C-alpha cells in the first residue's frame, strides 16, 4: 500500500484524500489543518489522523473535540508521498520540509512550474513522471485544456489553439472574495498564464489564451477554437471525445446550457460533492468550419485535478508504469464513468 499524506485538507486536499482512500493500492496516513474547522471535524468522521503545523494550537483542537496525532513533521515520517493542498504560493515554502523528510511530493497548479520542475497530466506525460521525487499537477483550467488538446492532437494534429477562459469568481464556500457585480479581466494583457502553463505539459502546442473572472462560483467555462492539420467531420471529433475516459459530453437531450444546470445534474447523478471530474463539453457547441474546431467546455475548479493527483501518485511511486492502467484503476475505484 502506498502511504499518502495530505498537507492542507481544504478544497482540493479533502477531495484527494477521499479519492486516495477509494483506491485499492493506497491509504491516507494523515491530513493536516492549521486550525479547528468544519473540514477538520469531517476529517475526524472519515477516520483521517489530523496533524498540525503549529503544536501550540493543539489545545484549541482539543477544545473543539479534534484529536491531534502530531506535527506535520511527524506525519511526513510515516508517508511515502505527500500531496500539498495548501493555498497557492504557500506550497513552495514547504519544499524544504519535504526535502528534509526525504518524501516525494505533489504540488497543485497554484504553484509555479519551477517548484517541481515537472508539470503533470495523466493522459499527456504519465510515463515521464515515473519515479520522480517532485511533481506539480497543473491547474483545473490547464488540466481541462491538456486533456482535450492532447486527444485532438493525437487524432488529427493541431496547428494552433485559441481559447477564452471565463473563470468563476470564487469557490462556493468562499465569502470574502468576488467580484459581486463586475466582469474582471484577469489579466487585461494577453496571453493569460493558461497557455504557457499548457506548454509545460505540451510544449509543441501553439496556444494563446485570454481570461476573465465573472460573478459565479459554479465552474469555469472555456470557449475554444482549435485549427486542425486536416479537415475532419463533426462526427469524427465527437467520436474522439466520446472515447476519452475523462471527457464528458453534455448531451442536447438534457437541455442543459449553463454551469448551474450542469452542477445540479451531476449532483442528481449522486457524485460525491457534486463533483465533475471530467471535462464537460457541450455537445451542441461542437462544430467544424473548414479545419477549425469550435466548442464550449465547463471545468469544475474544485474537482477535475483530483483524479490527476491519484495518477501522479502511482506514476511517482513507479509500481504502475502504464498510464491507461492507472487511469482505469483510478476511475473504477471511484465508480466514475465520464458523461
UniProtKB/Swiss-Prot annotation:
The keyword Cytoplasm applies. The keyword Iron does not apply. Its main location: cytoplasm. GO terms for molecular function: 4-hydroxy-tetrahydrodipicolinate reductase; glyceraldehyde-3-phosphate dehydrogenase (NAD+) (phosphorylating) activity; glyceraldehyde-3-phosphate dehydrogenase (NADP+) (phosphorylating) activity; NAD binding; NADP binding. It catalyses: D-glyceraldehyde 3-phosphate + phosphate + NADP(+) = (2R)-3-phospho-glyceroyl phosphate + NADPH + H(+); D-glyceraldehyde 3-phosphate + phosphate + NAD(+) = (2R)-3-phospho-glyceroyl phosphate + NADH + H(+). D-glyceraldehyde 3-phosphate binds at residues 139-141, 194-195. InterPro entries: DapB_N, GlycerAld/Erythrose_P_DH, GlycerAld_3-P_DH_AS, GlycerAld_3-P_DH_cat, GlycerAld_3-P_DH_NAD(P)-bd, Glyceraldehyde-3-P_DH_2_arc, NAD(P)-bd_dom_sf. It holds the Pfam family DapB_N. GO terms for cellular component: cytoplasm. This is Glyceraldehyde-3-phosphate dehydrogenase. The lineage of its organism: Archaea, Methanobacteriati, Methanobacteriota, Stenosarchaea group, Methanomicrobia. The gene is gap.
Amino acid at each position: 500500500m502506498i502511504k499518502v499524506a495530505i498537507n492542507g485538507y481544504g478544497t482540493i486536499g479533502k477531495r484527494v484524500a477521499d479519492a486516495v482512500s477509494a483506491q485499492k493500492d493506497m491509504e491516507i496516513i494523515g491530513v493536516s489543518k492549521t486550525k479547528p474547522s468544519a473540514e477538520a471535524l469531517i476529517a475526524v468522521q472519515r477516520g483521517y489522523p489530523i496533524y498540525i503545523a503549529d503544536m501550540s494550537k493543539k489545545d484549541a483542537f482539543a477544545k473543539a473535540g479534534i484529536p491531534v496525532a502530531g506535527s506535520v513533521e511527524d506525519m511526513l515520517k510515516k508517508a511515502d508521498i505527500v500531496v500539498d493542498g495548501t493555498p497557492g504560493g504557500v506550497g513552495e515554502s514547504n519544499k524544504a520540509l519535504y526535502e528534509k523528510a526525504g518524501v516525494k511530493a505533489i504540488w497543485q497548479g497554484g504553484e509555479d512550474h519551477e517548484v517541481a520542475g515537472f508539470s503533470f497530466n495523466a493522459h499527456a506525460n504519465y510515463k515521464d513522471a515515473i519515479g520522480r521525487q517532485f511533481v506539480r499537477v497543473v491547474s483545473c483550467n490547464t488540466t481541462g485544456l491538456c486533456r482535450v488538446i492532447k486527444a485532438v492532437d493525437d487524432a488529427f494534429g493541431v496547428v494552433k489553439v485559441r481559447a477564452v477562459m471565463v473563470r468563476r469568481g470564487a469557490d462556493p464556500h468562499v465569502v470574502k472574495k468576488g467580484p459581486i457585480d463586475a466582469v474582471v479581466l484577469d489579466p487585461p494583457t494577453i496571453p493569460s498564464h493558461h497557455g504557457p502553463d499548457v506548454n509545460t505539459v505540451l510544449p509543441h502546442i501553439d496556444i494563446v489564451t485570454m481570461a476573465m473572472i465573472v460573478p459565479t462560483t459554479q465552474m469555469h467555462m472555456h470557449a475554444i477554437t482549435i485549427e486542425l492539420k486536416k479537415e475532419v467531420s463533426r462526427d469524427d471529433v465527437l467520436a474522439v471525445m466520446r472515447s476519452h475516459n475523462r471527457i464528458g459530453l453534455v448531451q442536447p437531450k438534457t437541455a442543459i446550457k449553463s454551469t448551474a444546470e450542469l452542477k445540479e445534474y451531476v449532483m442528481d447523478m449522486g457524485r460525491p460533492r457534486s463533483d465533475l471530474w471530467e471535462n464537460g463539453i457541450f455537445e451542441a457547441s461542437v462544430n467544424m468550419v473548414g479545419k477549425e474546431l469550435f466548442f464550449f467546455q465547463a471545468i469544475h475548479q474544485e474537482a477535475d485535478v483530483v483524479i490527476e493527483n491519484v495518477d501522479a501518485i502511482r506514476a511517482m511511486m513507479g509500481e504502475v508504469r502504464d498510464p491507461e492502467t492507472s487511469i482505469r484503476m483510478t476511475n473504477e475505484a471511484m465508480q466514475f464513468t465520464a458523461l
